[in-house]
Amino acid sequence: MKILIGLAILFFNAAGAPQPSALQQQNTALTAIAGPDRVVVLPSKTFLNGYVGYGDPPRRERRRNEPTPPPPPNPGPAPIAGWSKESGPGPVVFADAKALSTTAAFTAPGAYVLKLTADNGQARAFSTLSVIVDTPPPATHLNAVYTKNYRINSPLWSHRAESLIVNWIPHCIDQINRGDLEQGPGGIDNFVEAGKKLAGQPHGNHKGYVFSNAWVHQTVEAMSIALMIDPQGDQEIIKAQAKMKATLDDWIPKILAAQEPDGYLQTAFTLPRIDGKGVVTPGPFNHWERRGDHEGYVAGYFLESALNHYLMTDKKDARLYNAAKKLADCWVSHIGPAPKKEWFDGHQEMEQALVRFGRFVNDMEGGGRGDAYIKLAKFLLDCRKNGGEYDQSHLPAVQQYEAVGHAVRAVYSYSGMADVAVETHDPEYHSAVRSLWDNIVNKKYYVTGGVGSGETSEGFGPNYSLRQNAYCESCSSCGLIFLQYKMNMAYGEAKYADLYEETLFNALLGSTDLEGKNFYYQNPLDSGTPRYPWHGCPCCVGNIPRTLLMLPTWMYAKTVDSLYVNLFVGSTATIEGVGGTDVQMVQVTDYPWDGNVSLTVNPVRQSRFSVRIRVPNRSVSGLYASTPEADGIASITVNGEALKPMIEKGYAVISRAWNAGDKIDFILPLKVQRVRSIDAIAATQSRVALRFGPLVYNIEQVDQDITQTLEPDSPLTAEWNGSLLGGVMVIQGVFAGGGKMTAIPNYVRNNRGPVPDPATLTPPPGGGRPAPRPPTSIVWIREK
């Protein structure tokens, strides 16, 4: 917030007549900007980076197609700046209250307001920022449940998983095997040619983007996870899984042959490169020299793919796992404090992957074997500075409090920061990642759980700028799920799982069509474009299925004496190492169509531990309010006996000695809800969204005129339609004009239109874009 108080400054022409244009008056006003609101986790301090000057400060990044800003205005007298505490329950100590860049320290938790004052002797300007000071984080954190062999028995998820396994992943395999793609080239052929070069044989050039290896690694991971799903006799799934096994047998030797002797692996650095004009650059290409070469992006996906491949083989095939350690060791050998190289990558997948991989190596091997990878993650994040907002290098990581720049890079970076905060117990990392989470969820978050409004190159826009025709890239939804999940691991609070459920069921689940043959790169809430089979930048194609199919990881978390239930999906999975035993968990539920959930707890032997069940909260984000209320758990029984469990951090806690066959039954309230946004979001004023449980709904032109208006209190009902879109709960109502209204879940939107011709594929980001089509499916309905 900024407040301007002072004198207008006028410009004069040669004759002495004043020429106070509106732009000049705006650009010459004395201005103070304190900076973003933030969270401080004790005993951390907060970093203040204020601005005092005339007019708005220069931005590091301009929005897409924004004209070059005018030159800076002639300043008035040099202003004097000063920081002060305006309100709060305890003292605030500024390192230097007269410096724009300084720190503030707190001793007491609570809500504070800090003020920055600018004074030039003629005028004064003020700006404030809010600080929430919180107590230190818990000393321990939740532990991951690795996705291993599991079974899905959910009507919704069984169909979605089958479409990914039978159609989408095999389609990705076929595309990656092709050497003639014009859109999104650069598949397994790059590894083949790199292997030839390393073997001293004649070879071709690198195809596609420098980061094209990424979707190969993603697809390897997606195949590995898909092979851990019990086909339950489904012949189509069995056939598709056989294709995946054969593909892995074919691809893995080719990938390993492309790894350089020191462990480095990225074929764009091994092979000559050819640009769009056919010009060949033979190399050599120096490692860790150009931040835009996506070295960490590619490497991080390889580490994650190796992790899940190793699990899929029950730790019997260590080829990719050992190669991933060799690659990570290569980075550790070259990147780090002097005499090693100081470095950060332009796309932060390595930062997201390293702690996950390091923990995994420690779990597999012990002895701190993975600790060096965790330390490298922190070093890479610590090196981020002196750059721009686009790749989150505009400030040191611990001084970042507002989500800015490219949304995928941002959520990957923040995901890594959450891991580092937990591993290092660094209060400055805790403060930064809590602040970034708060900024996203309460200022830059779509009702579908998507992020990235697209004003700044596929990125975050200003606070509350949530236009409905952009952007919500599928990869940003994947990254946001990882971020929310890691926040849940760090703080043990159910609200983070509430949010990744929202993103999973809405922004990401509908990124592929119902058949699993086409996908969306973007997921705007107002849309009129059909999905497409491939993309000029197919960065999402493997990311979508690897994230959606990792269900046991999203469903459960654990400590030595607690088992956390975060998602409700009909399924069978085994959680290892709770209460000194392994526990098979069997969920029986038709959620989200029905709120009845039955959990059967099957420990290998009797054991005492706590089962902690997430108590849903549909309104975690402060941007939206839903009515009527549909939070909580309506009733809960254990072996038929009713109980009222304690609620801790959003979880219903049931502590007892568990025996195989013990059953927990509970009911989750599911109601049709109207969702309205706060006034600060201009794009959604006089509009209402609908939801049922975790699902946000759309109305579509194929069913009605979507420009019609709803009365604010008109009756709405949920009705099951088994013949529509594979079987969905629809919301029925009547528009103000008397016409029937039918709303369908957001994830099944745009599944009743024509399938696009591959020749009409969307061009890659950064290129020319086709004119947007009028929306045929919308989330926010006009409200009378």
Give the positions of each predicted feature:
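C-terminal beta-rich recognition modules with glycine/proline-rich loops and embedded aromatic residues
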Residues: V433, D498-N506, S511-N602, L623-V638, ...
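Proline-enriched interdomain boundary motifs that mark the N-terminal boundary
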Residues: T28-G35
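Acidic, Ser/Thr
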Residues: N49-P58, P70-P75, E86
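Solvent-exposed segments in extracellular or luminal domains encompassing
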Residues: L100-P109, I654-R656
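Surface-exposed, flexible coil segments in extracellular/virion-facing regions
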Residues: I80-A104
